[in-house]
Amino acid sequence: MSLSIGEKAPDFSVNDQDGKPVRLSALQGKKVVLYFYPKDMTPGCTVEACNLRDNYKLLIKQGYEVLGISTDNEKTHQKFIAKENLPFRLLSDTDKQVHNLYGTWVEKSMYGRKYMGTARNTFVIDEKGIIEDIIEKVDTKNHTDQILRKGQANVASPAAKKVAAKKTVTKQPASKKAKSKR
């Protein structure tokens, strides 16, 4: 299934890391960041989750509820949350139903071998349950900034502000050589 910005986000109900059901439609009235990632405790997924963790207060301040979703089970999610001190819920989609609804269970290729896996995509869903943004080329180190960039150019994470500050430093002109004697 291919989804588009402006469409109603497909509703679903899956368990979080504690076995508690999470239904997307029950979150109406809140903005939701629904990020699909391949696997708990792998390098890229850890970088992405930690970027969201480090900027969680900023995301909450902007009104977002963050939900990660993978095909991992609840026990693996619990370990990942404990190890990385993640403040948001991780959803278990072991049967891949939500992945299929959102078009994130896809054929991939590595070293010429084809296999099925999770496309690292994020869906930003507004308070009415409408898809506001789809991020298909996720930058795991700067994911929060990708989420906030859409329509909110004045909001940036602390890491982005540091990068911006470094970029705005201007070089001082080279000192003029002393005039040689005539």
Identify the meaning behind each predicted range.
Residues 1-182:
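Chalcogenol-based redox active-site neighborhoods
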